[in-house]
Design a protein with these regions (language model features):
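Short amphipathic alpha-helical recognition elements used for nucleic-acid or partner binding
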Residues: 22-56, 77
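Short acidic/histidine-centered micro-motifs embedded in hydrophobic/aromatic stretches
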Residues: 55, 94, 145
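Intrinsically disordered, charged and Pro/Gly-enriched terminal/linker segments
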Residues: 22, 38-39, 61-65, 97-167
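DNA-binding patch around the recognition helix
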Residues: 1-6, 71-106
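Short boundary/linker motifs that mark transitions into or out of structured domains
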Residues: 1-30, 88-95, 136
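Short hydrophobic/aromatic patches on the structural cores and recognition surfaces of FHA
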Residues: 13, 52, 77, 111, ...
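An acidic helix/loop motif centered on a single conserved Asp/Glu
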Residues: 22-31, 61-64, 68-72
């Protein structure tokens, strides 16, 4: 595997050469990465600089040191993501957006795509979906208020899908 991001079960990232780069993500960088990804997956608008700072550092009116910390953290995250083909954190119109090419596989985004696709499902479709979710709880070990809506959506949708499959 290469260019791989797993958010179901244990957080796990492989670079373009298939090297495990998970350890490069400090807890704060992992939180930052997931936050930007989640907000980018909702219509591609990303997250405002103000909301990102409030959610990660808990400041509605950030000081210069908090803004500096945010900038340094974004730079560190970008440096890590350079190791994965065509993954970028963009800053446009005061919003951070995570952009991934189709060469990058992310189980969370694959799950969202699967859930959005309303066509009739076959046995192989359900097996593919099960393969995604069988790695474990989405964002395992992560517990932040801003994650609750995203976790709820995945959990509720998964129950709905599995209920239909059983019927």
């Amino acid at each position: 595997l290469r260019n791989y991001i797993r958010l179901f079960g244990e957080f796990y990232v492989l670079d373009r050469d298939g090297n495990d780069i998970t350890s490069l993500f400090t807890p704060k960088l992992k939180q930052l990465f997931i936050l930007i990804m989640l907000h980018s997956s909702r219509g591609g608008f990303g997250i405002s600089s103000k909301d990102l700072t409030r959610m990660i550092w808990g400041n509605d009116n950030p000081s210069k040191s908090t803004k500096s910390l945010r900038s340094v953290s974004i730079l560190k995250l970008r440096k890590i993501l350079e190791r994965i083909d065509t993954v970028e954190v963009l800053f446009n119109a005061n919003r951070y957006i995570l952009q991934l090419s189709e060469d990058v596989y992310c189980d969370y985004l694959a799950c969202l795509d699967w859930l959005k696709d309303k066509r009739v499902r076959t046995q192989p479709d359900f097996e593919y979906f099960y393969d995604i979710i069988s790695k474990g709880e989405v964002f395992k070990g992560e517990s932040f208020d801003w994650m609750d809506d995203f976790k709820s959506y995945i959990c509720n949708s998964t129950v709905d899908v599995l209920s239909r499959f059983i019927d």
